[in-house]
């Protein structure tokens, strides 16, 4: 069922970094086929478990799924869409005792306004999945376009490529492909 380790010290950010394509596909299936949230999250959790099977890692990917789905609507301000995504994900995870216990680790992302106001020096961007989702959301909340979001993520230091990938995925969903600087696209091989 999974290859990833499930211990508490196995909460790296690798599965979160790779989950974006799955989230986009599941969002499409929800729109086209009426796939239910519970089914989407089962799939997201199984995908995470390929490399990171601890519930905290799987929940991070689940929260990311909700962020992708809500940001793709682009019908409200970014902070409002993110808050809605977090509210929906917390409501889902509060239904299960195990995941409900894990929600304490996500306390800093519970309120987008409070998260946005945290000082940069208090944002960690290492390899721990909780740090990564916090940093990605913080970067998105504290910028107003794709480029600045990705640069802010990189400038946090530490695990810069992963934090930028996680934040950049969400920024790309919200701001769109045309928001990516052309000179960044030009250097992509075989694009």
Model-derived regions: residue spans:
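Amphipathic alpha-helical interface segments
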Residues: 1-143, 149-155
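Conserved phosphate/anionic-ligand binding catalytic regions in large, soluble enzymes, centered on
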Residues: 13-17, 160-173
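Alpha-helix C-terminal capping segments
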Residues: 24, 142, 169-178
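Short amphipathic alpha-helical leader/targeting segments
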Residues: 34, 167, 182-186
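Extended hydrophobic-aromatic, low-complexity segments
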Residues: 146-150, 162, 181-183
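Active-site proximal loops enriched in glycine and acidic residues that flank catalytic Cys/His/Asp
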Residues: 153-154, 164-167, 188
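Conserved glycine-rich phosphate/nucleotide-binding loop
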Residues: 173, 177-191
């Amino acid at each position: 069922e999974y290859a990833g380790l499930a211990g508490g010290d196995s909460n790296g950010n690798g599965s979160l970094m790779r989950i974006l394509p799955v989230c986009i596909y599941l969002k499409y299936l929800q729109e086209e086929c009426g796939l239910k949230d519970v089914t989407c999250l089962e799939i997201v959790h199984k995908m995470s478990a390929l490399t990171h099977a601890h519930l905290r890692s799987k929940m991070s990917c689940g929260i990311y799924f909700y962020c992708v789905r809500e940001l793709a609507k682009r019908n409200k301000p970014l902070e409002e869409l993110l808050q809605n995504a977090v509210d929906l994900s917390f409501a889902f995870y509060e239904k299960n005792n195990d995941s409900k216990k894990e929600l304490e680790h996500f306390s800093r992302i519970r309120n987008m306004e409070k998260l946005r106001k945290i000082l940069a020096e208090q944002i960690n961007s290492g390899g721990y999945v909780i740090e990564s989702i916090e940093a990605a959301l913080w970067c998105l909340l504290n910028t107003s376009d794709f480029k600045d979001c990705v640069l802010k993520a990189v400038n946090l230091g530490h695990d810069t490529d992963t934090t930028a990938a996680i934040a950049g995925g969400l920024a790309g969903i919200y701001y769109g492909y045309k928001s990516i600087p052309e000179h960044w696209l030009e250097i992509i091989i075989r694009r």
